[in-house]
Amino acid sequence: MADYQLIVIGAGPGGYEAALRAAKLGKKVAVVERREAGGTCLNRGCIPTKTLLHASAIYRDAKNGAHCGIHTEDIHADMAEIFAYKRAVSQKLSAGIETLFKTAKIDLLRGTALITGSGCVRVADADGSANDYTCDDILIATGSVPSRPPIPGLELAMTSDELLEGCDHLYRSIVIIGGGVIGIEFATFYADLGCAVTVIEGMDRLLPNMDKELGQNLALILKKQGVKVFTNAMVQRVEQAGEDLAVHFTCKETEETVSGEAVLCAIGRRAYCDGLFADGVGVEMNGRSIAVNANFETSLPHVYAIGDVSSKIQLAHVATAQGIACVERLCGVQDHTDLSVVPSCIYCRPEIAVVGLTEAEAKEMGIPVKVGKHVMFGNAKTVIADPGRCFMKLVAHAETHELVGAQLMCEHASDMIGGVAQALANHLTAEQFCRAMRPHPSFEEAMTAALEDLCERLG
């Protein structure tokens, strides 16, 4: 008889949620984790960055409160205390996951996992001792790690993992290589605190994988906040330059140099499955990711993979949804989440949140669409908060009127995109989504204005 019915490798948002769901469905479950419960998201990613952004927003608003009668003197940011706050939040949430495991009678096996065969996992402790476990099924949820491309001198730059370890002082200046989600959130954090920030992006705009207007609008807002932005810029090398680091890059066929006390490499992440399989044991790969079918099965029988290690979309909530769907299918339970509808958020100011197709993507796919838009100059809550130019765009099929996408750039966009995702998952038309009364004053009432514009265009 096997030791467990399911062994989950990795206690991140995909792994721990899958384990909890499997235990609730009656499985005997173990989770292998060599670091803190919660994985990258909780300890080196989503939650730490949001904690830092919460702290920097308090500083920014206090420092800039004179326009509404709030006057402060001698305000300063203590970086050691900010990072201590970040650690305390992560530790509290990590401890909460371990408590959930105990309540659900899930065994947390501390150590590094090695898959020695179908249904066989060896767990090595830090001291080198190892124990072998058998199981009916294995779920790989090992996540991803920061990428560092082969650019000369890039080893001098930090990754997000290293930056989040903390620093006891505020950098005078920082150069961020990469204008995607990770780079933009760190740019926001350091700009809020008064650090001189430069962002270098290789594509023609920030957030190149999103709607064009989002990246263009973000660049304008960041520049107003004092951030230098270079696009169509390819980094050639990084060098030590006295106390600073010099980043050399080409922009419009001209070589440029910008220096900073620190450099962050935020070019992306890669699937992490290093050393996961014993010699002679392996699975089919899709590039550097583990290949899976629609049911998350790998080429090795009874071995499954979810989240960043196998998914094209590297988001914590995607890993969670995939993990839950995987174990529900294993247990013969009908899964209910539409995995094709994926909201995505960027926690800059104003926030950005998207779901579904952009107008350009729909047209490339041959889908006839109409777009409704509302610029929030007259939205009362936006005028009060004054985060910069905000807008909402909604995309619908021109013939069926079914909503197919949305792009929000406004305060609390991350808290509103879930409602739009619900509309997409349930195939609501623009007219159906417009029926709901939205509260006033609120940021969300701009959704009604965007929907009314969309309905007029649909006819």
Predicted stretch roles:
Residues 2-4, 20-27, 32-171, 198, ...:
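Glycine-rich flavin
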Residues 1-12, 170-180:
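Beta1/beta-strand and adjacent pyrophosphate-binding region of the FAD-binding site
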Residues 155-170, 257-329:
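FAD-site-proximal beta/loop scaffold in flavoenzymes
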Residues 7-14, 18-35, 40, 47, ...:
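Flexible, glycine-rich terminal cap/loop adjacent to redox cofactors
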Residues 7-9, 113, 132-143, 176-177, ...:
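Short hydrophobic core segments
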Residues 19, 23, 187, 191-192:
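Gly/Ala-rich phosphate-binding loop of Rossmann-like dinucleotide-binding domains
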